[in-house]
Regions:
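N-terminal donor/sugar-recognition subdomains of glycan-related enzymes
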Residues: 1-2, 27
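Generic N-terminal amphipathic, Lys/Arg-enriched alpha-helix
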Residues: 2-16
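Glycine- and acidic-residue-enriched helix-capping/strand-helix junction motifs
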Residues: 17-25
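Catalytic, metal-anchored helix/loop core of enzyme active sites in primary metabolism
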Residues: 18-19, 30-36
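Small-residue-rich beta-alpha loop regions that form the catalytic core of phosphotransfer
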Residues: 19, 44-46, 53-98
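Alpha-helical scaffold elements within enzyme catalytic domains, especially in hydrolases
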Residues: 29-30, 81
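Short internal beta-strands
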Residues: 36-43
Length: 98
Protein backbone atom coordinates (compact mmCIF):
# COMPACT_ATOMS: atom_id res chain seq x y z
CA UNK A 1 0.00 0.00 0.00
CA UNK A 2 1.33 3.43 -0.89
CA UNK A 3 1.07 6.65 1.11
CA UNK A 4 -2.15 7.57 -0.68
CA UNK A 5 -5.33 8.07 1.31
CA UNK A 6 -7.39 4.98 2.03
CA UNK A 7 -10.61 5.37 0.03
CA UNK A 8 -11.99 1.83 -0.37
CA UNK A 9 -12.69 -0.05 2.85
CA UNK A 10 -14.06 -3.54 3.31
CA UNK A 11 -15.98 -4.18 6.52
CA UNK A 12 -16.61 -7.65 7.93
CA UNK A 13 -18.48 -8.43 11.13
CA UNK A 14 -19.00 -11.53 13.22
CA UNK A 15 -22.57 -12.71 12.73
CA UNK A 16 -24.73 -12.36 15.85
CA UNK A 17 -22.17 -10.26 17.74
CA UNK A 18 -24.27 -8.39 20.35
CA UNK A 19 -22.50 -5.06 19.83
CA UNK A 20 -22.34 -5.35 16.03
CA UNK A 21 -25.43 -3.32 15.15
CA UNK A 22 -24.37 -0.40 17.34
CA UNK A 23 -20.78 -0.38 16.09
CA UNK A 24 -21.72 -0.79 12.42
CA UNK A 25 -24.43 1.84 12.81
CA UNK A 26 -21.76 4.37 13.78
CA UNK A 27 -18.82 3.11 11.71
CA UNK A 28 -20.44 2.83 8.26
CA UNK A 29 -21.94 6.37 8.21
CA UNK A 30 -18.68 7.82 9.54
CA UNK A 31 -16.64 6.10 6.80
CA UNK A 32 -19.05 7.34 4.14
CA UNK A 33 -18.85 10.86 5.57
CA UNK A 34 -15.07 10.63 5.04
CA UNK A 35 -15.81 9.92 1.33
CA UNK A 36 -14.78 6.28 1.61
CA UNK A 37 -16.38 3.61 -0.54
CA UNK A 38 -17.51 0.89 1.87
CA UNK A 39 -17.73 -2.75 0.79
CA UNK A 40 -19.80 -5.03 3.03
CA UNK A 41 -19.82 -8.80 2.88
CA UNK A 42 -23.22 -10.50 2.75
CA UNK A 43 -23.39 -11.34 6.47
CA UNK A 44 -22.43 -7.83 7.53
CA UNK A 45 -24.88 -6.23 5.11
CA UNK A 46 -27.66 -8.45 6.50
CA UNK A 47 -26.95 -7.28 10.08
CA UNK A 48 -27.68 -3.65 9.20
CA UNK A 49 -30.22 -4.29 6.42
CA UNK A 50 -28.00 -2.99 3.60
CA UNK A 51 -28.97 -4.25 0.16
CA UNK A 52 -25.55 -4.01 -1.47
CA UNK A 53 -23.01 -6.71 -0.57
CA UNK A 54 -19.94 -8.43 -2.00
CA UNK A 55 -18.08 -11.72 -1.69
CA UNK A 56 -15.01 -11.79 0.61
CA UNK A 57 -12.60 -12.35 -2.24
CA UNK A 58 -14.08 -9.52 -4.31
CA UNK A 59 -13.79 -7.13 -1.36
CA UNK A 60 -10.19 -8.20 -0.74
CA UNK A 61 -9.29 -7.55 -4.38
CA UNK A 62 -10.73 -4.03 -4.42
CA UNK A 63 -10.21 -2.61 -0.92
CA UNK A 64 -7.32 -0.48 0.35
CA UNK A 65 -8.04 -1.61 3.93
CA UNK A 66 -10.16 -4.28 5.61
CA UNK A 67 -11.83 -3.74 8.99
CA UNK A 68 -12.81 -6.92 10.83
CA UNK A 69 -15.16 -6.76 13.82
CA UNK A 70 -15.26 -10.09 15.59
CA UNK A 71 -13.18 -12.78 17.18
CA UNK A 72 -10.35 -15.02 16.03
CA UNK A 73 -12.53 -17.05 13.68
CA UNK A 74 -13.85 -14.01 11.85
CA UNK A 75 -10.36 -12.55 11.54
CA UNK A 76 -8.85 -15.81 10.27
CA UNK A 77 -11.59 -16.24 7.67
CA UNK A 78 -11.02 -12.75 6.29
CA UNK A 79 -7.23 -13.13 6.45
CA UNK A 80 -7.42 -16.30 4.32
CA UNK A 81 -9.35 -14.45 1.62
CA UNK A 82 -7.18 -11.33 1.79
CA UNK A 83 -3.77 -13.00 1.87
CA UNK A 84 -3.21 -13.20 -1.92
CA UNK A 85 -3.97 -9.47 -2.29
CA UNK A 86 -1.65 -8.12 0.43
CA UNK A 87 -4.32 -5.79 1.82
CA UNK A 88 -3.89 -4.51 5.40
CA UNK A 89 -6.38 -5.63 8.05
CA UNK A 90 -7.54 -3.68 11.10
CA UNK A 91 -9.03 -6.14 13.61
CA UNK A 92 -11.39 -5.11 16.40
CA UNK A 93 -12.00 -7.88 18.94
CA UNK A 94 -15.66 -8.48 19.70
CA UNK A 95 -15.06 -12.05 20.82
CA UNK A 96 -14.55 -13.35 24.31
CA UNK A 97 -11.15 -14.19 25.70
CA UNK A 98 -10.26 -17.78 26.37
Amino acid sequence: MSNERVKKIGVFCKPKAPSAIDILGRLIPWLRKQNCHVFLDTGTADIINETSSYEKREISQQADLLIVLGGDGTLLGVARSAHPYNVPILAVNLGSLG
